[in-house]
Amino acid sequence: MFHSIHNVVLERMRYLEEIDAKDREDGTPRLQRLRQIPSDTGRFLALLAANAPLGECIEIGTSAGYSTLWLAVACEELGRTITTFEVLPEKAKLARETFQVTQMGKVVRLIEGDARLHLAQYDNVAFCFLDAEKEVYEECYEIVIPKLLKGGLLVADNAISHQEALKPMLDRALEDKRVDALIVPVGKGELVCRKI
């Protein structure tokens, strides 16, 4: 999977990595920054998604589409698609450009809007990556977990870097008898929940 990533995808990943690094240094306002995952987290997510059961693959928080590309690599390998949600119009526009430039539009379905308004229509969720504003994590968790297939995965970003802000949701997940959960120290910390 990693050895067969198309050059246009790798080029776009590098381009987005450069923008993200610049955003972190030049004082770009927080909501305008890409705030994307590091590449090792992307690889980790792709491996998890590639081993999830057959079902829906969704992402909550697209930004410019960097993490989506990693998930799309896994989905393309398996002949699946991913649906990703982005609430900010300017980031959705950049994500559309990402998927067009990389020719991943056939694998990725971008929905512009609040994921919480759309998640009810998804059953049979095999994999969900949650990387949105921290105040929506707990609500998204409670919507997604009942929709996960047995063996399905919910992965939430920033479980270590934003541990205090996410504490109620993290505590809930780690004690939730519907899932096996742990925090993995990859990137900014990934909460990984597997539906029992």
PLM features: residue spans?
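A short alpha-helical cap/connector motif
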Residues: 1-127, 134-155, 159-196
